[in-house]
C-alpha cells in the first residue's frame, strides 16, 4: 500500500519506532526439509531462476512448508502459477507424505486438465523424486524442473508466498488455531482471500484469479 500511495519510510525509522513501541519483527521458525538424498530421479534445473512468463499456465512451482502449533505440526503443499502468483491447488496435512502430493496434483489437474508443455519446478525433495510424481507430470505432458540442492533462491517465488502467508495469518496468531480443523478452515479462507481479493503489484493491482482471467481473455 505504501507503493500505491507513493510513500516511502526509511528502514532505520521503522526500527526506531519499533524499539519505542517494544515491537519485534516476525521471525521464521523451524523449517521443513524434504531432501533425503537421491531417492529417485533428479531433474535438470530448467527454470534456473527465470521466473518470467508470457501468460498463465506456462510455469508452476511447488514446495512444502511446515507450521508448528501447540497440538502438533502441520504441512502445506501448494502449487503456484509463476505468471499470476495464483495458488492453483494445495493440500494441508499433519504428515508430509505422498498422499498429500497426490491430492494436490489431482486438484490441479481437475481445474486445468490441459497443461501440455507446462514446466513444474520444485526443490530436490523426496516427494518430487518419487516415481508417482514424475509419472503424473509425464502423463500430463509437463516438463519437470528442480532447484539445485540446498539453494532456496532457485525457488524464491514460492518462498515469498510462504513468508507472506505466515506473516499475514500465522505468526502471532498460533493460539487462534486450537485444532487441525480450525487451522484448516483458516488456511482455506486465506487462500480464497489471497487468490480472489488480495491485490499485488505484479498482477497490475488485481487479485491473482482476476489477473489470470484478464490475461487469458487477451490471449
Residue ranges and their predicted role:
Residues 6-7, 52-53, 69-70, 124, ...:
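Conserved, non-catalytic sequence blocks in retroelement Pol enzymes and Pol-derived host proteins
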Residues 138-142, 166-219:
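C-terminal domain-tail junction helix/linker
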Residues 49, 53-88, 94-98:
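An active-site-proximal beta-strand-loop segment
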Residues 91-113:
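Active-site beta-loop-alpha junctions of metal-dependent nucleic acid enzymes
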Residues 2-55, 151, 207-216:
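Basic, flexible linker segments flanking DNA-binding modules
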Residues 27-32, 120-124, 138-157, 173-178:
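RNase H-like polynucleotidyl transferase catalytic core
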Residues 3, 14, 18, 47, ...:
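Mobile genetic element proteins and their domesticated derivatives, centered on retroelements
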Residues 36-38, 122-124, 130-131, 146-166, ...:
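RNase H-like two-metal-ion nuclease catalytic core shared by retroviral integrases
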Amino acid at each position: 500500500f505504501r507503493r500505491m500511495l507513493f510513500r516511502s519510510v526509511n528502514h532505520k525509522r521503522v526500527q526506531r519506532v519499533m524499539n519505542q513501541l517494544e515491537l519485534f519483527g516476525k521471525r521464521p521458525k523451524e523449517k521443513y526439509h524434504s531432501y533425503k538424498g537421491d531417492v529417485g530421479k533428479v531433474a535438470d534445473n530448467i527454470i534456473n531462476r527465470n521466473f518470467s512468463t508470457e501468460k498463465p499456465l506456462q510455469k508452476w512451482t511447488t514446495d512444502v512448508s511446515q507450521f508448528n502449533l501447540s497440538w502438533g505440526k502441520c504441512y502445506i503443499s501448494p502449487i503456484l502459477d509463476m505468471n499470476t502468483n495464483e495458488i492453483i491447488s494445495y493440500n494441508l496435512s499433519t504428515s508430509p507424505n505422498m498422499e498429500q502430493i497426490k491430492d494436490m496434483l489431482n486438484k490441479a489437474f481437475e481445474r486445468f486438465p490441459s497443461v501440455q508443455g507446462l514446466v513444474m519446478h520444485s526443490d530436490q525433495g523426496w516427494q518430487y523424486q518419487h516415481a508417482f510424481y514424475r509419472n503424473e507430470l509425464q502423463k500430463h505432458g509437463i516438463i519437470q524442473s528442480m532447484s539445485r540442492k540446498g539453494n532456496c533462491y532457485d525457488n524464491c517465488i514460492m518462498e515469498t508466498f510462504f513468508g507472506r502467508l505466515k506473516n499475514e495469518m500465522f505468526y502471532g496468531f498460533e493460539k487462534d488455531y486450537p485444532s487441525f480443523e480450525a487451522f484448516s478452515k483458516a488456511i482455506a479462507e486465506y487462500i480464497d482471500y489471497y487468490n480472489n481479493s488480495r491485490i499485488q503489484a505484479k498482477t497490475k493491482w488485481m487479485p491473482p484469479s482476476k489477473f489470470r482471467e484478464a490475461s487469458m481473455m487477451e490471449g
